[in-house]
C-alpha cells in the first residue's frame, strides 16, 4: 500500500561533461526541490561536500536524528551516467542499495539517498519538459564532442539549471498527482519504479473486495494468496510481446505501411477477464473436464498440454529453438499455456494431443474500473492542457508488469556484511565469487536460497494480459495475410494493399484499443531481425530506423552511414557501468565504443546497394 511520506529534504542534480565520459566533469547543478536554491559545482567532491553541509544544516535546524533524516537526491538516468562520475567503484560497492537485475534504483551513501527518476518515469527528460511546459534546451555541441577550448558560459549554466528545474517540477507534479490517485489525506513517498506506483494506486482504489483474510487478532487484512503451484505454472506460461520478421529477412518490401495499437495492454486489461488468485484450483486432466471448463464464461483455465496444428493452421505460439532463441514459426507447442491462446489455437485448427495438467479459477474483472477511470481522467486532463496526463499514460501501461515480477536473487556487495557472514559461519548459505575474477579484490555473495519474493506477484494477471495481447496481434497479422512482413508486440508492418482487409479486423483511430498509423505513407521496408528494421524511400532516404543496442548517430547527432544496414559493422557508444567496471577492470563511467555485427547478416550483400 502507499507509504506516508516522512520529513525529508530533496534535491535534483544534473551534470554536464566533456564528451561521453561521466568522469570528465565540466560543471553541474544541484537544486533544492522545494526552495529552488541552486548550487553550481565544478568538481564532484564539491558537490558531495555541499550536499553533506545541507544535510547537517537540515538535521540541526529541524532537530532530526541521524536515524530519522531523509536526504534525497534525484537525477534522471543518473545511475547510468551522472552518479558514475560522482562516486567511485568502492563507494557504490559499499553502499546500501536496491537494484533490479543490475540496474541500481537507489543507493544510500554517507546518509544520502541517491535515486534515479528514470526508473520511475521511463521517458526522456525532454519529453517530461515538453509535457510540463518547461522545454529542455539542446545540449551545446562542445559538451557532446568534448571541446574544452570553448569554456563554460552563463548560458551553459542556465541550460543545466533548466534541466534541474524540469526534474524538480516533475517530482512535485507526480507527488501531487500520486496523492490524488490514492485518495490519501497525507503526502506519500514516491515509489522507486513505475510498476510499483501503478500497483499501489490500483491497490488503494480497486483492490478486489473479496481479497482479504482474518488474522489471529480477528481483524480483516487485505491480502490474497494461493498455492505456489498455480503461480509457478502461470509463470511458465508468461511470455512477452511477439517480435518477429514475418517476411523474408533482408528482402526489400515496397508499398509498406505500419500501424500500432493504442495502449494494447491496458485495453486487454479493461476488456477481458482474469483468473482469481483466491479461487485457483485444479482437476483431473481429462478432455471432458477441459472442454467443459473452456466453455464456461465464468472460468479461466491454464493447462500443461501439447498442441499440434493442422495442415492449414498458421504458427503463432511462442516456442524456442534448440539454441534457446524465441521462435514463432512452429505449429507444435508443448508446455503451459493460458486460455486466450488455447482458444485461439483451437479456432485455427490446432488439436490437443496431450493434456498433462489442468488448472482453473473463477473469472474476475480486476482492471476494468482502473483503466476506464484513468483513461477518462487522461482525456479530461489533455483537454485542459494538464501536464499530469503524462503520468497516467505511464501508470496504465506499467501495472500488468508488476504482477509478473520474478524472484530477485539476494546479492551482497558490502565488504563488512561479507566479513560478518564469514565470521558467523554462514558462508555455506551463499555462493562466493569475485567481480574481478582471479584478481580477487572485489568479492560478492549471492544467496543459495531465500531469494526476495515480490509480495505483489500473481502471474495470472501478467500472463493472461500478454496472452490476450498476442491473440489480438495475431488476428491482425492473419487479416494482412501474405502482406504481413513484421510485428512487434502491438504493431504490424504490412503491404498497403492489404489495408481494406485489415480494416475488417482493426479500427483506425486515437481511442483506447484502436490502431493508429506509425508509417502512413507507403514506402520500402527491410526487416533484418527482431528489433532491427529500416523504412527507406526509392531515393534512399532513411525514413525510420530501428536497431536495438547500437548507436545510429555520431557524437554530433548526425546519422552514421551504416545505420540501418546490418550487413555492415555497427557500433554502440555508452559508458562503463558499475558491474562491468569491476568485472573488466575498466574505469567507471568512461566512454566505451563496442563493435557489433549481426551473426545472421554481417558480410552479406547489402540490400541497400542494389
Regions found by a protein language model. Give the residues of each.
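Conserved acidic
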Residues: 2-12, 20-27, 31-610
Amino acid at each position: 500500500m502507499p507509504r506516508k511520506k516522512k520529513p525529508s529534504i530533496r534535491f535534483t542534480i544534473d551534470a554536464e561533461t566533456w564528451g561521453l565520459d561521466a568522469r570528465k566533469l565540466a560543471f553541474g547543478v544541484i537544486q533544492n526541490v522545494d526552495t529552488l536554491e541552486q548550487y553550481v559545482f565544478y568538481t564532484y567532491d564539491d558537490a558531495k561536500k555541499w550536499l553533506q553541509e545541507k544535510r547537517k544544516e537540515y538535521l540541526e535546524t529541524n532537530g532530526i536524528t541521524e536515524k530519522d533524516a531523509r536526504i534525497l537526491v534525484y537525477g534522471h538516468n543518473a545511475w547510468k551516467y551522472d552518479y558514475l562520475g560522482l562516486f567511485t567503484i568502492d563507494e557504490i560497492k559499499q553502499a546500501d542499495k536496491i537494484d533490479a537485475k543490475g540496474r541500481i534504483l537507489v543507493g544510500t551513501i554517507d546518509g544520502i539517498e541517491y535515486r534515479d527518476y528514470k526508473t520511475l518515469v521511463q521517458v526522456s527528460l525532454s519529453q517530461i519538459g515538453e509535457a510540463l511546459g518547461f522545454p529542455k534546451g539542446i545540449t551545446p555541441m562542445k559538451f557532446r564532442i568534448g571541446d574544452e577550448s570553448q569554456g563554460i558560459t552563463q548560458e551553459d549554466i542556465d541550460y543545466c539549471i533548466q534541466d534541474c528545474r524540469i526534474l524538480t517540477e516533475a517530482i512535485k507534479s507526480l507527488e501531487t498527482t500520486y496523492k490524488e490517485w490514492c485518495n490519501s489525506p497525507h503526502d506519500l513517498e514516491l515509489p522507486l519504479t513505475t510498476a510499483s506506483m501503478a500497483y499501489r494506486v490500483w491497490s488503494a482504489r480497486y483492490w478486489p473486495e473479496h481479497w482479504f483474510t482474518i488474522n489471529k487478532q480477528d481483524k480483516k487484512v487485505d491480502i490474497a494468496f494461493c498455492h505456489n503451484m498455480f503461480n509457478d505454472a502461470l509463470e511458465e506460461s508468461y511470455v512477452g510481446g511477439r517480435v518477429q520478421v514475418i517476411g523474408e529477412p533482408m528482402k526489400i518490401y515496397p508499398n509498406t505501411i505500419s500501424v500500432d495499437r493504442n495502449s494494447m495492454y491496458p485495453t486487454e486489461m479493461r476488456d477481458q477477464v482474469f483468473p482469481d488468485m483466491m479461487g485457483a484450483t485444479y482437476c483431473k486432466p481429462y478432455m471432458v473436464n477441459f472442454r467443459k471448463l473452456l466453455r464456461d464464461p465464468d472460468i479461466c483455465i491454464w493447462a500443461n498440454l501439447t498442441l499440434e496444428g493442422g495442415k492449414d493452421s498458421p504458427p503463432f505460439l511462442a516456442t524456442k529453438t534448440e539454441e534457446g532463441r524465441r521462435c514463432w514459426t512452429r505449429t507444435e507447442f508443448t508446455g503451459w499455456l493460458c486460455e486466450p491462446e488455447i482458444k485461439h489455437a483451437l479456432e485455427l485448427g490446432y488439436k490437443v494431443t496431450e493434456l498433462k495438467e489442468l488448472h482453473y479459477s473463477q473469472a474476475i474483472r480486476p482492471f476494468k474500473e482502473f483503466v476506464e477511470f484513468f483513461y477518462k481522467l487522461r482525456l479530461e486532463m489533455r483537454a485542459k492542457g494538464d501536464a499530469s496526463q503524462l503520468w497516467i499514460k505511464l501508470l496504465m501501461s506499467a501495472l500488468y508488469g508488476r504482477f509478473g515480477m520474478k524472484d530477485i536473487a539476494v546479492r551482497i556487495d558490502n565488504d563488512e556484511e561479507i566479513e560478518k557472514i564469514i565470521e558467523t559461519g554462514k558462508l555455506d548459505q551463499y555462493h562466493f565469487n569475485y567481480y574481478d575474477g582471479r584478481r580477487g579484490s572485489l568479492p560478492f555473495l549471492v544467496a543459495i536460497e531465500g531469494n526476495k519474493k515480490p509480495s505483489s506477484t500473481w502471474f495470472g494477471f501478467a500472463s493472461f494480459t500478454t496472452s490476450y495481447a498476442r491473440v489480438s496481434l495475431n488476428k491482425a497479422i492473419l487479416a494482412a495475410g501474405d502482406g504481413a512482413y513484421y510485428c512487434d508486440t502491438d504493431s504490424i508492418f504490412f503491404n498497403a494493399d492489404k489495408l481494406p482487409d485489415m480494416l475488417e479486423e482493426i479500427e483506425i483511430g486515437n481511442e483506447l484499443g484502436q490502431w493508429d498509423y506509425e508509417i502512413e505513407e507507403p514506402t520500402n521496408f527491410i526487416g533484418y531481425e527482431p528489433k532491427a528494421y529500416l523504412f527507406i524511400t526509392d531515393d534512399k532516404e532513411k525514413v525510420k530506423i530501428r536497431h536495438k543496442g547500437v548507436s545510429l548517430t555520431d557524437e554530433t547527432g548526425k546519422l552514421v552511414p551504416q545505420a540501418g544496414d546490418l550487413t555492415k559493422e555497427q557500433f554502440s557508444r555508452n559508458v562503463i557501468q558499475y558491474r562491468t567496471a569491476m568485472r573488466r577492470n575498466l574505469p567507471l563511467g568512461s566512454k566505451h565504443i563496442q563493435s557489433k555485427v549481426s551473426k545472421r547478416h554481417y558480410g552479406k550483400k547489402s540490400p541497400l546497394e542494389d
